[in-house]
Amino acid sequence: DEWSGDAGGGNWIVMQMYRKVYENLILKDVNTPLVMEYVKAMNLGSKVDFINSWSDLKDGENTECKVLHRKIIQLFFELLERSNPEVQALANQMIKCAAYTIDAAVRELHFFGEKIPVYLSGSILTKAASSGYLSMLKEALSCICQGKLEVHMCAKRPVEGAVQLLKG
């Protein structure tokens, strides 16, 4: 979210990846490993192709746009697993945001107890994220929340968990 600084959703990843490539390829005229991998994955032949790809990426709901978004998100997590420093910086921003958001929710909802169960959900966490990213997130949560949380991956849709919680 542009206002709150919330980082980590699929659109956010796509925009940040595009911005990093734009910064390096267009503004600095530098072919970093991220630029080379992005251009290859997106099948772009020139700087003009890259700039023109923006309209395909921002188109939102059409099938081609969704395919391109998935491709960039997959590339993001692949590069993270290969320790790409530019992607690592973005992942750190995402992790920090997620960990502080979860900590704030625990505090605001007045959850108490020795161990508070937290179920991670959302398509990025449950479908796209790499095991390395999830480990980094769990480690950040452990530090920020001082080990109070018992972190699990949501195996079902989040709404099913909410209904189950209400039923008791």
Q: Where are the language model's segments positioned?
A:
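Glycine-rich phosphate-binding loop of actin/hexokinase-like ATP-binding domains
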Residues: D1-L25, D29
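ATP-binding/phosphotransfer module of carbohydrate and carboxylate kinases, centering on a glycine-rich
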Residues: Y18-G168
